[in-house]
Amino acid sequence: MAKGTFERTKPHVNIGTIGHVDHGKTTLTAAITFTAASADPTIETLAYDQIDKAPEEKARGITINTAHVEYQTETRHYSHVDCPGHADYVKNMITGAAQMDGAILVVSSADGPMPQTREHILLARQVGVPYIVVFMNKVDMVDDEELLELVEMEVRELLSKYEFPGDDLPVVKGSALRALEALQSNPKMARGTDKWVDYIWELLDAVDSYIPTPERDTDKTFLMPVEDVFTITGRGTVATGRVERGTVKVQDEVEIVGLTDTRKTTVTGIEMHRKLLDSGMAGDNVGVLLRGVARDDVERGQVLAKPGSIKPHTKFEASVYVLSKDEGGRHSAFFGGYRPQFYFRTTDVTGVVELQEGVEMVMPGDNVTFTVELIKPIAMEEGLRFAIREGGRTVGAGVVSKVLE
């Protein structure tokens, strides 16, 4: 069947399935595509094995296997990610390769929360996944209603422990496999025909109503990482880069943040593809002409931003994935005092790593939290991604989980 073009009239939301291995994340992803397609024939259905053979992709120098599926409900268009292996989740969430506006936490009702359930919730907290909806899968394998209540309580407590609103967030119970089997035998099944399929609809309703539509990048406060700087004789200094978020207009005041002292200036012109514009918005590659700024006052690695919206920092706590030897990472462990380069947006800055108490060393392949002190300040906020490099090769990826100073 040919892929239909998606109507972009609906708001777009990025979500994904998270949870312990074999609890049914991929089966649920397949069941969701079949459920959505039963009401809308333009949606492509994907069977389990089509999702499970996730293609490799690269993000910040790291290879990750991720399956992307698309579907829509009456009110929204969704991009949904599912990863085959636990390590792929860790890498995906830390690099931000697949940004999630919300996640569906899949828990097997027969097993309850398991180690990776906890680990994925912690990761979601550290990398800033803002909303979680729970799907208690495999309820057909549990006869005891009290046992189901117990598992639900455990999951809610675990979420509360990691600062999610465990008491209030939606928990939907069902069986992804039973729903998938029902839909594979009758793809055009109407809602209300089969209870297992209806549980998937209930989950989609919960996702629709509980996970808010994200603010569009263009509506956020302006920020542009500086990639290059040059002088136009008689007109002044131009900083070029891709607008990361927000909008910038001619005559706007902006701050130049990072590496040295923050300074304010005014935008006197904006160019894109050699044409003059009134404004540049998220996603545009632009040249921004800055008033009264010398060529040496602005450099790659700084950002232009709305005044007061972002501050330069040197010390932060990070959640980090360290590449294994097979992934082209280090061959040996590192210890406290390790001094690699931290690549933020467009530049490398040297920093010193301080490990948490009780952690002797970090091995290639580890997922770890530690503190970093940079030798120069970088425009920083929680959720900012970075790569860790040695001599230009990537040895790790991280996300700022807490700004310290």
Swiss-Prot record:
Region (G3): 82-85
Catalytic activity: GTP + H2O = GDP + phosphate + H(+)
Ranges where the record places region G4: 137-140
Pfam family, one: GTP_EFTU
Region of interest (G5), residue spans: 175-177
Uppermost EC category: hydrolase
GO aspect biological process, one term: translational elongation
Matching InterPro entries: EF-Tu_GTP-bd, EF-Tu_GTPase, EFTu-like_2, EFTU_2, G_TR_CS, P-loop_NTPase, Small_GTP-bd, T_Tr_GTP-bd_dom
Gene Ontology CC, one term: cytoplasm
Region (G1): 19-26
Binding site for GTP: 19-26, 82-86, 137-140
Database matches in PROSITE patterns: G_TR_1 (PS00301), G_TR_2 (PS51722)
Region span, G2: 61-65
Family matches, as SUPFAM superfamilies: EF-Tu/eEF-1alpha/eIF2-gamma C-terminal domain, P-loop containing nucleoside triphosphate hydrolases, Translation proteins
Keywords carried by this UniProt record: Cytoplasm, Elongation factor, GTP-binding, Hydrolase, Magnesium, Metal-binding, Nucleotide-binding, Protein biosynthesis
Compartments reported by the entry: Cytoplasm
Gene Ontology terms for molecular function: GTP binding; GTPase activity; translation elongation factor activity
Binding site for Mg(2+): T26
Documented EC number(s): 3.6.5.3
Residue span(s) of domain tr-type G: 10-215
Described purpose of this protein according to its UniProt entry: GTP hydrolase that promotes the GTP-dependent binding of aminoacyl-tRNA to the A-site of ribosomes during protein biosynthesis.
Similarity section: Belongs to the TRAFAC class translation factor GTPase superfamily. Classic translation factor GTPase family. EF-Tu/EF-1A subfamily.
The protein's assembly and partners: Monomer.
Name of the protein in question: Elongation factor Tu
Encoding gene per record: tufA
